[in-house]
Amino acid sequence: MPTTDSARAADIKQPDIKPRSRDVTDGLEKAAARGMLRAVGMGDEDFAKPQIGVASSWNEITPCNLSLDRLAKAVKEGVFAAGGYPLEFGTISVSDGISMGHEGMHFSLVSREVIADSVETVMQAERLDGSVLLAGCDKSLPGMLMAAARLDLASVFLYAGSILPGVAKLSDGSEREVTIIDAFEAVGACARGLMPREDVDAIERAICPGEGACGGMYTANTMASAAEALGMSLPGSAAPPATDRRRDGFARRSGQAVVELLRRGITARDILTKEAFENAIAVVMAFGGSTNAVLHLLAIAHEADVALSLDDFSRIGSKVPHLADVKPFGRHVMTDVDHIGGVPVMMKALLDAGLLNGDCLTVTGATVAQNLAAIAPPDPDGKVLRALSDPLHPTGGITILRGSLAPEGAVVKSAGFDSDVFEGTARVFDGERAALDALEDGTITKGDAVVIRYEGPKGGPGMREMLAITGAIKGAGLGKDVLLLTDGRFSGGTTGLCVGHIAPEAVDAGPIAFLRDGDRIRLDVANRVLDVLVDPAEFDSRRTAFTPPPPRYKTGVLAKYVKLVGSAAIGAVCG
């Protein structure tokens, strides 16, 4: 008898929608585990359902995460509706806005690793089958995506959303739209006598009008856009603000999507391919996004076992134009991107130009090209997002540098440069505080190349962001006249002439450790070169006398971190 189509279909092995949770639900010996699960609400009929971890970085410390408790509830509704059983758990999150400019910032980047480790720990210990990962601020986004890549289960990422811009009423009677970055810059302006204290107060009270992540194309919004481009979040979900009820719909659909991924046997690494990372880099370059995206995409790729390097950023950045007129260098915020159609507008423009891979799989189960065809986003509006025929800059908004000062690499947000070359005289500081003191004393002047070292992943430790000093430099009116270089990082809200992630870092005997006041430093953005103009023999003599400083932390999480963390050039990953 010939085999029928239905018989053939029956012979095809379907994916197990409970690939792990059977370890805690099936068999006589699992009676104790089932008893525990009954206590949290599961009944007999629920033990046949896939168990979905709903991991959230919700807390009350920062507005970035305030909406996540509401969104997690909606995710669980979606999981239930699709036939799964959701189990919610929490992880940490650090507020960079609150931690900036003091000892607390040492603990920011390590929180990325703690988040990834903690999510992995719960998912592995409880044998959960899949996950929806919710995050709202800078390090929680990559931390969640690193966990997804490491676990390689059915996973969907969901962003909390951006804050709305505030409006400050200033002493001259004017009104000004502001974000949190304006507060850092106002401090520098006030210190130089360029702004009255009452205006600083007005800005302080206006910058955060409600819940959501910092509103420009800073680190959180950059990484949310990258997650959408990677295919790890639902199309169109990055741009709507945190207070927009469309987010509840995205949350419910994210819960449904993860169960469907289980049914189809699609896991995170099926989505997180080399081509998907290239798509994410292209979108970050076109938006002129945060330099932190370089660090984080390298780290996520490491967890996904994808070979990604700084050379990939250089290659893609050289052919993808900068299209978005968004803060910190531009005029618009993420809400404006949402108003003109969101991240799909950018992705469709890049796809049409052959700068995006449309065949990459996404959490919808469809490809990038299929998703965009279904959405049919409009063309760029010409103001918030430029057409490819009329870019802000012909190349991407981030440039990878190499040279005698950065043999392994460095990163600059070239979207903010008006000229390609800067040559200045080194003013060398061991740590950010000393540089801030010099700025406040008026001893940093036009033409200086301010070097802040021993702020790398190991030397900091924790690779602190330098928003306090960059904001103060801009506020003091020196943003276009002073070059800032560091083995640390910059906030996604940083503006000005800023080179970060210099590798090797000072504590690892990188060239930045041997700089002295008065050395000449040359930055050539067009040719992607960062050099110190000192005779090599002189530099070698300084190297032989080098002794690294002792570790700043002898106990606790940072003492462990220093022993494990690698170079910024490979994402500052541990292990």
Swiss-Prot record:
Stated family: Belongs to the IlvD/Edd family.
Region (Disordered): 1-25
Lineage, opening ranks: Bacteria, Bacillati, Actinomycetota, Actinomycetes, Mycobacteriales
UniProtKB keywords: 2Fe-2S, Amino-acid biosynthesis, Branched-chain amino acid biosynthesis, Iron, Iron-sulfur, Lyase, Magnesium, Metal-binding
Cofactor annotation comment: Binds 1 [2Fe-2S] cluster per subunit. This cluster acts as a Lewis acid cofactor.
Catalytic activity: (2R)-2,3-dihydroxy-3-methylbutanoate = 3-methyl-2-oxobutanoate + H2O; (2R,3R)-2,3-dihydroxy-3-methylpentanoate = (S)-3-methyl-2-oxopentanoate + H2O
Record text on subunit structure and interactions: Homodimer.
NCBIfam families: ilvD, PRK00911.1
Species of the source: Mycobacterium avium (strain 104)
Entry binding sites for Mg(2+): 96, 138-139, 465
Molecular function terms from GO: 2 iron, 2 sulfur cluster binding; dihydroxy-acid dehydratase activity; magnesium ion binding
Sequence ranges of Basic and acidic residues compositional bias: 8-25
Residues at which [2Fe-2S] cluster binds: 64, 137, 214
InterPro entries: DHAD_IlvD/Edd, Dihydro-acid_dehy_C, DihydroxyA_deHydtase, DiOHA_6PGluconate_deHydtase_CS, ILV_EDD_C, ILV_EDD_N, IlvD/EDD_N
Residues annotated with N6-carboxylysine modification: 139
Entry protein name: Dihydroxy-acid dehydratase
A family per Pfam: ILV_EDD_C
UniProt-annotated catalytic positions: 491 (proton acceptor)
A Gene Ontology BP annotation from the UniProt entry: L-valine biosynthetic process
